[in-house]
Amino acid sequence: MKKLFITTTMCLAAFMASAQCCENSAYEVKAENAYTNYNVRYASNPQDAKHYTTDRLRKEFAIEKIFAPGEVNWTYTMFDRFLIGGAEPTTAPIKLTSLACLYTDKPTDKKRLLDNRELGIINIGGKGTVTVDGKSYDLDFQEALYVGRADEKNNKEIVLTSKDPANPAKFYMNSACAHQSFPTKKVTL
């Protein structure tokens, strides 16, 4: 009985921690030189989703805001713990920071965005630069960069900049869980 009580209490505490992290659908976290916004989407039961109205489908699945000048916008979905985001640096560089909803066990400032994650970045705007741990990668329109999982030496800091604020880079980003680190690699057409 005591073991059941402890297990139940621990499960409840974990649930409360995740609920506290994600109790509102949108958060605004001040990052260096920009705002990082994110919202959390919970997984939907396929049997329930069949009966959603058009408005409910849009609310559950459409991502309304991906790009905004000087901001990073993320959507964290419980389907595969996937992050979908966009960044549009204008006059100031944008540093990618961790999100509170990714880590409930430690303070966010002790975590990096790519702890246990990998990141793909595609530039769909003007010319821009992605700097990973001090090494710069220039990305033109439709060029991409793969950034592997962070480890003790690599992928600790990611900074995004635009070459021309009048025609800013628009970095579309996807991040998924990763269990192995691979080197950063630029991909061109």
Model-derived regions: residue spans:
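A generic local secondary-structure boundary/capping motif
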Residues: 72-73, 110-111, 155-163
